[in-house]
Amino acid sequence: MLRLGASVGVHQGSRILFSDFADGGQMWTGNGPREYRLDVTFPEPFTRTPAVTVGLSMWDMDHKTNSRMDIGAENITPQGFQIVFKTWGDTRIARVRADWLAIGSVRDDEDWEIE
């Protein structure tokens, strides 16, 4: 975790969501609404729910069909979140990689708890 001052931290990562061309998966062979979800767990939890942003860093698709996609973060907690990728219609997607960034409050080294 990168710490930005005493109580703000950042986690970031990059994940291949799927490679459906290789195995004939639904994003490549399907039609209509399709969705893929990937659980991401932070290496160290935040103290409160962080702000999370997700973007595409690689998108390999069929040039013969329309390009349609929606990507975002859902079910965000201090421990992690889900990357959600959606497409619809005749879109055929071979592979997708997503990059993400989470920023939020973290414990300070000088914080202490009374039990």
UniProtKB/Swiss-Prot annotation:
GO CC terms of this entry: cell surface; phagocytic vesicle; protein complex involved in cell adhesion
Taxonomic superkingdom: Bacteria
Gene Ontology molecular-function annotations: N-acetylgalactosamine binding; oligosaccharide binding; polysaccharide binding
GO-annotated biological processes: cell-cell adhesion
InterPro entries attached to this UniProt entry: Galactose-binding_lectin (IPR052487), H-type_lectin_dom_sf (IPR037221), H-type_lectin_domain (IPR019019)
Alphabetical list of Gene3D superfamilies matching this protein: 2.60.40.2080
Name of the protein described by the UniProt record: ATP synthase subunits region ORF 7
Source species: Fuscovulum blasticum
